[in-house]
Amino acid sequence: ALGACFGLLVAFATRVCVQRFAWAKNLHRELRPLTRGLTGTGIVALALTSSLGEELLFRGLLQPWLGLWLQALLFGVLHQLAGSSRWVWASWATLVGFALGAIFALTGSLAGPLAAHALINGLNLSYLKSHDTEPPAGLGGLLGSRG
């Protein structure tokens, strides 16, 4: 239940950030082409397989060996992208990796982090595919838009 709640919270926070902040809109625009050609079944398959592989590697294998902080940092670094929003994506992935690792540390099970990760990936891939964003207006969006 903890993992599912965290996954839903992160997916909701992603939507709020994309609607409100220029940096999140830019990241959304840079990632959106990756969903081109994905079907609903493809999104589910990608969300499940990537989550399973990453949780087995980062939380199951690396966290017991490297610890919570280092596995989270490595998780973020390995999510590095090309493009102007790469630092945002890597930072976000580091924070999420830390939280997933904390769930694993608290519960001693990969079930929670896996549920969270699959929900985050599935819901965010669906959102990326189905929602376009308008270009941000100037630098003011860095601190949020006013409407």
Residue ranges: model-predicted function:
Residues 1-11:
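Alpha-helical transmembrane segments
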Residues 10-13, 17, 79:
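Hydrophobic membrane-targeting signal helices
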Residues 15-31:
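Membrane-helix interface/capping segments
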Residues 23, 33-147:
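Transmembrane helix-loop-helix hairpins at the membrane interface
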